[in-house]
Amino acid sequence: MENAELEVLEITRQMLEAMYTGDPEVHRKHSAADMSSYEWYIAPQRIDGLEFHLKLIEGGGNGTAGRLDILTPRVQLYGDTAIVNYTLLKTSFGAESQPPQFATMNETRVFVKIEGIWQMVHLHKSPTK
C-alpha cells in the first residue's frame, strides 16, 4: 500500500475506535461538517451532518467493543479522494463463562483531502447477512 492509503486506513481505524471510546475529536478533525451517511441500524434514510455523529459519540457512541477488526480493507485513491471499504468485525466479551459475541457489517467511507487533511464526506454501512 502507498503512504496515502495507509494514512487513510489508519484514520479509519481511529474513527472506529473513537465511536466506542466516546472521543469525538477524531471525528471533528477528519469529518466534513456536511458529511452524509447511511446507517441501516439507525435510520432507513440518509443522515446529513457531522453534528449527529458528534452527539452520538458524546452520548456513549456505539457502546463497548472488546475488539474491532478491519477485514479485507481496500483503499482506492483518485487524486485527493480516497474510498475505503472493508468488513468490520466487532467482538464483544461477556462474563468469563460466556462465549464471545461477534457482529459484522460492510462499510464504505469516502474521504477528500481538504487543506491537507483527509476528511470523511460520506459513510455507508450495510448488514452482512
Predicted regions and their residues:
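Residue-level signal for short segments within beta-strands and strand-turn junctions
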Residues: 39, 92, 112-113
